[in-house]
Every structure is written in structure tokens, then in C-alpha cells.
Amino acid sequence: MAKLHDYYKDEVVKQLMSQFGYDSVMQVPRVEKITLNMGVGEAIADKKLLDNAAADLAAISGQKPFITKARKSVAGFKIRQGYPIGCKVTLRGERMWEFFERLITIAVPRIRDFRGLSAKSFDGRGNYSMGVREQIIFPEIDYDKVDRVRGLDITITTTAKSDDEGRALLAAFKFPFRK
């Protein structure tokens, strides 16, 4: 079991129960899933780019990504409905906790010119979204085998009812928010 999951059960639950005055342990917000999304717009011209992006995402997450397709045709972007334009992975359970631990302890500190993550990226329901400009911050990616530096979106979905609860949950995990 991931250390972060044990830390959540032992420390974070107690801390949040006292902070928000919950009656039951089940009221305490928890991390439900983490979604990684990589939009590869250049895949329209070269299908190989999407395969490389999917391989990178599989290495980062430890799970085979789902290829996302365009929902509707957009002439300005030269895409048609059904074209493969990205890939995504939804992590839950053990893999989610392991990825979350790697994200906080290894990947985020490796971001160039890192000054902390924005605390304003909550969606109003306690879910947090962040963008990563380079996939090479993850140790699973071999820098020499990267064909192109691409970014990805990371969404942390929680059971929190408000942004304050979600922020307190992530802060309890020592999430590096900007001061």
C-alpha cells in the first residue's frame, strides 16, 4: 500500500475532522481519482506522434491510455469528427495513490522555475486541475528517447463539497501551493 494512503488514513482524516468538525469519518473529503490528459493536436498530420504520446502517458501512469477522438468537426483546426487527437488515463485505487505520491515528492519539485502551484485552480466543487508543460519531469520518461516535449493536464477529483475543503485536503498532503 502507498505511504500516502496510510498517511491519509492516520493523519489527514484526524486533522480534517478537527478542522471542519465532521461527525463521521465518511464525511471527510478524500481523493477519488486522478485523470491525466494529453491533447496532441499535431496528431492530425502525423499519427506516430499520438502513439509516442500514448507511450509516454503509459510510462507515467503505469496504465494503457484511452485514445480520445474529436467530438465535432472544426474547419479552422482541420479536424473532423472522430479523428484521434489525444489520450487520457483515469487512475483510481492503489495506482492513484502511487502516482499522487510520485507527483508530490518527485515530479513537482523537478518543474523548471517552480514557485508553487496556484491555489486558484479549484473548480468550485473541491476538484483541482493543473497543467504540466513538460512530461520529462516524471522519472519514468527517458530524456534521450523523447521525440518531442509535450505537456499534460492533471485533474485531482475529490469528494470535497467546496474549494476550501479540497484545498485543506491537498494542503494536508503537503501539496506545494504558492504562498
From Swiss-Prot:
Pfam families: Ribosomal_L5, Ribosomal_L5_C. This is Large ribosomal subunit protein uL5. The keyword Ribonucleoprotein applies. The lineage of its organism: Bacteria, Pseudomonadati, Pseudomonadota, Gammaproteobacteria, Enterobacterales. The keyword Heme does not apply. One of its GO terms (biological process) is translation. Part of the 50S ribosomal subunit; part of the 5S rRNA/L5/L18/L25 subcomplex. Contacts the 5S rRNA and the P site tRNA. Forms a bridge to the 30S subunit in the 70S ribosome. This is one of the proteins that bind and probably mediate the attachment of the 5S RNA into the large ribosomal subunit, where it forms part of the central protuberance. In the 70S ribosome it contacts protein S13 of the 30S subunit (bridge B1b), connecting the 2 subunits; this bridge is implicated in subunit movement. Contacts the P site tRNA; the 5S rRNA and some of its associated proteins might help stabilize positioning of ribosome-bound tRNAs. It comes from the Bacteria. GO terms for cellular component: cytosolic large ribosomal subunit. GO terms for molecular function: RNA binding; rRNA binding; structural constituent of ribosome; tRNA binding. Keywords: Ribonucleoprotein, Ribosomal protein, RNA-binding, rRNA-binding, tRNA-binding. Belongs to the universal ribosomal protein uL5 family. Coiled coil: none annotated. NCBIfam families: PRK00010.1. SUPFAM superfamilies: RL5-like. It comes from Yersinia pestis. Signal peptide: none annotated.
